[in-house]
Amino acid sequence: MRHLKTFEFIEAVMRAGSIRRAAEDMNITASALNRRIQNFEAEFGWEIFERLPRGMRLNPAGELLMQHIRSQKNDLARVQSQAADLSGERRGHVSIACSQALLPYFLPRQIAVYRAAHPGVTFSVHVRDREQAERDLATFSSDLALVFEPVHLVEFDVICALPQPVNAVFSAGSPLAGKATLRLRDCLSQPVILPATPYGVRHLLEIGARKIGLNLSPMVETESFEMIRHYVAQENAVGFQIPIGLEKTMRDDIDFRPISDRDVPVGQLLLGQMKRRALPVASSRFADQLVTALSAAELTSVPTG
């Protein structure tokens, strides 16, 4: 554990890209930080940074070391959490990368329930698109990911999956509100506001539009599902979201309906972690709670037909 502080300095230089900026972030002089890293490199036996005219970046040996640093930090957090369990006091920290749809309702409730039972546990919630969430797991930036339609899944160990049909969101007075299930063609006949291309909802809509021979032509494109939800009340427009990010009680002036899976395939909301990673106790227990909650949500879901 004697190198833990040095590892923090190395991470700071990696993030900042220079000794000077990292020294400012870590409240240490640049000369002292440079000396600390040089001493570590001498002991390690290899240089870990490329010294470039405009800064520093990890070389291949440094990348290997960074993997070790992240693994060691994870192991230490897990042992600390286990030690807290032995004393009868649940402590620890849970970091989770998630899609925007989890922010309004599902995740706040789940965190509050967990913290009510274990107030010593803290949380970090990182809002990520589907590629960024997987990257967070790979770099140990997040313990868990709860993401809609992940891209690669190579190192993504799926813990639980919840089917999520794409829903159209519109003003309460829209003619679309008169139908239980919508066809994509009817939605696209209205002005539409779409999520940006990195998001799983957009990916499924692109598939559906190609299937029926139409192009997606948004009047507004945004990275914010919150903007989509509020904008449709300002204009006779149609937006899109998944059920876990929608509730009937959210606003009186907007409504939503599922789009038929004959047009748009049902997507998957996946809870996962990095393959072969042993999670800290708090994160593992929170994952168990999420599995229970997601399983209950699946039992109440309605087919889209």
Regions found by a protein language model. Name each.
Residues 11-29:
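Short helix-boundary/capping micro-motifs
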Residues 15, 41-58, 63:
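A short LG(V/I)-centered, amphipathic sequence patch enriched
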Residues 91-154, 222:
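Central regulatory/effector-binding core of bacterial HTH transcription factors
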Residues 106, 255-300:
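A late-sequence structural motif
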Residues 129-134, 138-142, 147-148, 198-257:
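Hydrophobic hinge/microswitch elements
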Residues 153-192:
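Flexible hinge/capping segments at coil-to-helix
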Residues 154-160, 164, 179, 226-276:
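Beta-alpha-beta core module
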Residues 177, 191-212, 279-288, 293-303:
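Secondary-structure junction motif
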